[in-house]
């Protein structure tokens, strides 16, 4: 990617997905903070078009508050862009609206504001579990908002510039398909650009160990991966890739297309092996013999280093699971050290809510409301909170609400174990 081109996630809004009832907004535009602490954290932001943009946003809160539902919703909506061009009529979309208060009869909506190759786009859609109701795409080619298309039901309106022969695409778009997804597959220029942003720039999770790209990514980033393992006091001194020939069962159909059996076919099997300082000549199988923490940091870094070097955005749910706190901070610091990459993550680790590491606007609290729905709000919204205060302590004491309420005493738990509580 050219050095002067910027890609950036600016904001996401979600409404009526899973435990999300009322609209929530995650904003990567930095707040108006001019404190000495914010100046010390200048690496946590980058500039685009006169605005400061956050490199990281963390979602904190108790179990079952909805952190993972936020990530699941974003993943679903992005997959709709990538995959809905192949949807058939009659498909039921893979999400559920909020179940209570009649919201299961209301539509759900998604909105994303982002920058792709220095141009800002606003894309949104509204849907039920069986059809697309509305969809729109706007952009700012000269810092002025312009329509590319807008869709309400089966009716479309188009801007004066944008997608070539737009009505032709509309005629080929069903009620279960996003217009953007269909247009991208027909090679329409702006639609293809936006589609590639979702495919290549806004990454939704971690690379899998058997992914074809993992070997090349590992070879490119081996030095820094080994450095990260040193941070967590690992005694791994080397990692190597081995290829073996193997066999896998492949279904064999009959002439009428029915499966009648399996045939063993040769395949290439890629395995990672680790070597440890105390016995550097003995290989260990990475997937079966290394700790969950080692495997976790490996898969995160493989993806995140690509993100950091190529100005991409990424989201990771429970990113510090099975990870030492120092290593979690190493990952955060890696993003802050990049030019303009971004990370959206969820965590239970209260130690990360640290004003020496994060600005107030980088920390979001996710809480369950009385009606069971998910609420999201930023530490920046607490105007009486100063960066000199202990944010971790305040969080654990319930000052920001998003902590589990545990009222059971040891005596109560003893009664519970004895079956004495009815």
What do these predicted regions represent?
Residues 101-156, 161, 366, 379-388, ...:
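P-loop NTPase motor core
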Residues 17, 318-323, 350:
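Conserved Walker B
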Residues 56-61, 254-305, 313, 319-323:
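Conserved ABC ATPase signature
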Residues 2-76, 421:
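Pre-Walker A-like glycine/lysine-rich segment at the N-terminus of P-loop NTPase domains
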Residues 2-8, 330-422:
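C-terminal lobe/lid and adjacent interdomain/linker elements of RecA-like ASCE P-loop ATPase modules
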Residues 324-329:
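Short alpha-helix of the ABC ATPase nucleotide-binding domain corresponding to the H-loop/switch region
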Residues 43-58, 62-64, 71-122, 128-129:
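Conserved P-loop NTP-binding catalytic core
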């Amino acid at each position: 990617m050219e050095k002067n081109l910027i890609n950036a996630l600016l904001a996401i809004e979600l409404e009526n997905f899973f435990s999300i009832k009322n609209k929530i907004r995650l904003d990567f535009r930095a707040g108006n903070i001019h404190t000495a602490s914010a100046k010390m954290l200048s690496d946590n932001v980058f500039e685009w078009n006169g605005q400061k943009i956050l490199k990281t946003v963390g979602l904190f809160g108790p179990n079952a508050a909805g952190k993972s539902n936020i990530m699941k919703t974003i993943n679903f909506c992005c997959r709709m862009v990538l995959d809905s061009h192949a949807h058939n009529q009659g498909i039921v979309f893979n999400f559920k609206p909020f179940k209570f208060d009649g919201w299961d009869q209301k539509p759900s909506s998604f909105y994303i504001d982002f920058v792709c190759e220095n141009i800002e786009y606003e894309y949104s859609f509204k849907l039920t579990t069986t059809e697309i109701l509305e969809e729109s795409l706007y952009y700012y080619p000269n810092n002025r908002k312009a329509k590319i298309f807008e869709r309400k039901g089966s009716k479309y309106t188009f801007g004066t510039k944008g997608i070539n022969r737009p009505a032709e695409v509309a005629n080929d778009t069903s009620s279960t398909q996003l217009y953007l997804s269909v247009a991208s597959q027909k090679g329409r220029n702006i639609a293809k650009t936006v589609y590639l942003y979702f495919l290549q720039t806004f990454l939704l999770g971690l690379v899998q160990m058997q992914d074809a790209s993992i070997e090349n990514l590992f070879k490119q980033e081996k030095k820094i991966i080994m450095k990260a393992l040193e941070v967590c006091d690992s005694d791994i001194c080397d990692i190597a890739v081995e290829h073996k020939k193997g066999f896998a069962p492949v279904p064999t159909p009959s002439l009428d297309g029915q499966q009648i059996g399996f045939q063993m076919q040769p395949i290439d099997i890629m395995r990672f092996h680790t070597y440890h300082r105390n016995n550097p000549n003995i290989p260990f199988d990475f997937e079966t013999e290394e700790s969950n923490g080692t495997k976790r940091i490996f898969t995160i870094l493989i993806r995140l280093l690509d993100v950091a070097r190529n100005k991409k955005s990424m989201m990771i749910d429970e990113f510090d699971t099975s990870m030492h706190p120092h290593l979690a901070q190493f990952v955060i610091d890696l993003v802050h050290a990049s030019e303009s990459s971004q990370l959206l993550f969820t965590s239970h680790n209260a130690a990360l809510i640290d004003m020496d590491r994060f600005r107030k606007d980088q920390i979001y609290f996710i809480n369950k409301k009385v009606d069971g729905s998910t609420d999201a709000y930023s530490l920046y919204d607490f105007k009486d909170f100063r960066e000199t205060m202990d944010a971790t302590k305040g969080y654990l004491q319930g000052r920001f609400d998003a902590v589990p309420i545990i009222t059971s005493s040891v005596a109560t738990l003893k009664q519970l174990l004895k079956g004495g509580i009815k």
